[in-house]
Amino acid sequence: MPEISRDQVAHLAKLARLALSEEELQQFAGQIDDIVGHVSAVQNVDAEGVEPMSHPHSIMTTMRDDVVVKTLTPEQALDQAPAVEDGRFMVPQILGEGD
């Protein structure tokens, strides 16, 4: 079973913009390694002859007809927005330049 390193967890944390302590990096490395082991065990299950399914129940859902309903105009939607520019909602920047 491949071992997940502390550096790999640190790299993933950076990509996810998470600030993790050294203790958390070590803890998560062990937990992710355990998860990979469990997934590996599931992959090794003999499923020969088992019919693939997306849900354990065979209940079929019924779809409703598409109905056109009145919605807000763009002006109505933007009317109560705290900040609008060029007909769009303005939101605070969360990513730095070049990220």
From Swiss-Prot:
The keyword DNA damage is annotated on this UniProt entry: no
InterPro entries: Asp/Glu-ADT_sf_sub_c (IPR036113), GatC (IPR003837)
EC number(s) given by UniProt: 6.3.5.-
Alphabetical UniProt keywords: ATP-binding, Ligase, Nucleotide-binding, Protein biosynthesis
GO molecular function, one term: glutaminyl-tRNA synthase (glutamine-hydrolyzing) activity
A biological process from GO: translation
Catalytic activity: L-glutamyl-tRNA(Gln) + L-glutamine + ATP + H2O = L-glutaminyl-tRNA(Gln) + L-glutamate + ADP + phosphate + H(+); L-aspartyl-tRNA(Asn) + L-glutamine + ATP + H2O = L-asparaginyl-tRNA(Asn) + L-glutamate + ADP + phosphate + 2 H(+)
Broad EC category: ligase
Task of the protein: Allows the formation of correctly charged Asn-tRNA(Asn) or Gln-tRNA(Gln) through the transamidation of misacylated Asp-tRNA(Asn) or Glu-tRNA(Gln) in organisms which lack either or both of asparaginyl-tRNA or glutaminyl-tRNA synthetases. The reaction takes place in the presence of glutamine and ATP through an activated phospho-Asp-tRNA(Asn) or phospho-Glu-tRNA(Gln).
Subunit structure and binding partners: Heterotrimer of A, B and C subunits.
Family of the protein in this entry: Belongs to the GatC family.
NCBIfam families in alphabetical order: gatC
Name this polypeptide is given: Aspartyl/glutamyl-tRNA(Asn/Gln) amidotransferase subunit C
Organism this protein belongs to: Corynebacterium efficiens (strain DSM 44549 / YS-314 / AJ 12310 / JCM 11189 / NBRC 100395)
Gene name of the record: gatC
